């Protein structure tokens, strides 16, 4: 037998993660519950969510800015937004687009008012409360495809300024779809 063998570790139960977060990190029950659900049995991911410098917070800010500027049809500031995003490294840009797809899905699921379907932090949910009504059956697939296509272009070494500005302009059109 080979010495390099795969060993599967079982996920930690969400209740155990929640309990550990309350005991070891002194979190309140609601926050611990949210983080445990998002982590899905991964203690390292739970600790990552606690980190205030978490990359997801920056991605959330960029997502909020994109959606607000697109809703206001502010082309000039969308151009600036795309230039800022273009300064990120390619891998970070791809992670950001993955995060955008996550927020899109969570915003759509928020419309169903089923908390067990939602995997959002408190900050994400605070934004989704008002934003979710703009994501519906008429536009979710097209916006998701747009983010996926943009990620593909970035991976293929396309000019990020052009990719992100084009994406931002298309989001304007897709957000107004009912």
Cite the ranges covered by each PLM segment.
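Charged, glycine-rich active-site and insertion segments that engage polyanionic ligands
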Residues: 1-99, 103, 110-117, 122-178
């Amino acid at each position: 037998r080979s010495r390099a063998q795969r060993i599967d570790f079982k996920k930690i139960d969400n209740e155990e993660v929640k309990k550990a977060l309350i005991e070891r990190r002194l979190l309140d029950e609601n926050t611990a519950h949210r983080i445990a659900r998002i982590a899905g049995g991964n203690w390292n991911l739970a600790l990552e969510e606690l980190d205030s410098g978490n990359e997801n917070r920056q991605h959330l800010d960029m997502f909020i800015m994109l959606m607000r500027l697109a809703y206001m049809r502010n082309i000039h500031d969308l151009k600036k937004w795309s230039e800022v995003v273009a300064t990120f490294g390619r891998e970070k840009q791809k992670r950001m687009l993955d995060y955008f797809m996550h927020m899109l899905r969570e915003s759509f699921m928020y419309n169903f008012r089923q908390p067990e379907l939602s995997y959002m932090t408190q900050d994400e949910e605070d934004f989704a409360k008002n934003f979710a009504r703009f994501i519906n059956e008429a536009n979710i697939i097209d916006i998701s495809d747009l983010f996926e296509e943009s990620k593909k272009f970035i991976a293929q070494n396309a000019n990020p300024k052009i990719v992100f500005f084009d994406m931002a302009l298309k989001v304007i059109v897709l957000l107004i779809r009912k």
